[in-house]
């Protein structure tokens, strides 16, 4: 069975390369991180930008974005755009390995605060918003926000169906009105 660990997308007009490290790479994080660093050097990339989600116990409507960078200028610019500095925390997986192997390449790590253990389109939209301004991409995050709303409504409907199915039925035919 062939397993893809990376998906690579190239936007030639903007000279951007997007690399998606597939989750579930346990045990291969270092090899994937090394491949990303090698590719960035091969392409003479100005910067590696890593996007990640971080679970938050808060139920806020919007997601905060945290930044950690080995490039002072990039970090300063992202802080001006509203990101908060990531000072501590445990980062694992490909992102954690990248953080430890990118000293020779300008690297910036953005973490979107998610409010569930499921995919969070609102958090993704916040990341897109920040990247849009930072890189001047002109990308509209509205489709992600719409997707988040649709997903949330489906979850609410499923929860309501589950609650409704647990309620006792008030069916007259089920009542015994005599003994005999």
Question: How would you describe each model-predicted region?
Answer:
Residues 57-134, 178:
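Catalytic cores of processing enzymes, dominated by hydrolases/peptidases
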Residues 106-180:
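Extended, histidine- and acidic-residue-enriched regions that form the cofactor-binding/catalytic faces
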Residues 17-19, 49, 106-111:
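Hydrophobic/aromatic beta-strand patches that form the interior of the parallel beta-sheet core
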Residues 14, 26-74:
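Internal, conserved structured core segments that host functional sites
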Residues 22, 52-54, 112-113:
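Histidine- and/or cysteine-centered catalytic micro-motif in compact active-site loops
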Residues 1-21:
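N-terminal short beta-loop-beta anion/metal-coordinating cradle
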Residues 8-13, 41, 100-103:
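Solvent-exposed alpha-helices and their adjacent loops that cap or buttress functional pockets
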Residues 15-25, 80-84:
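Short, basic, glycine/proline-bearing loop/turn elements
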């Amino acid at each position: 069975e062939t397993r893809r660990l990376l998906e690579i997308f190239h936007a030639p007009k903007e000279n951007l390369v997007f690399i998606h490290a597939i989750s579930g790479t346990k045990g291969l994080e270092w090899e994937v991180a090394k491949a990303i660093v090698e590719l960035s050097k091969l392409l003479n990339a100005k910067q590696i930008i890593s996007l990640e989600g971080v679970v938050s116990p808060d139920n806020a409507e919007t997601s905060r974005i945290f930044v950690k960078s080995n490039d002072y200028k990039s970090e300063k610019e992202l802080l001006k755009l509203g990101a908060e500095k990531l000072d501590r925390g445990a980062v694992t997986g490909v992102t954690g390995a990248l953080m430890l192997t990118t000293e020779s390449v300008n690297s910036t790590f953005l973490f979107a605060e998610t409010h569930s253990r499921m995919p969070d389109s609102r958090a993704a939209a916040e990341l897109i918003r920040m990247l849009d301004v930072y890189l001047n991409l002109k990308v509209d995050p509205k489709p992600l926000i719409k997707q988040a709303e649709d997903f949330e409504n489906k979850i609410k409907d499923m929860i309501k169906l589950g609650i409704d199915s647990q309620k006792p039925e008030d069916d007259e035919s089920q009542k015994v009105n005599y003994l005999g």
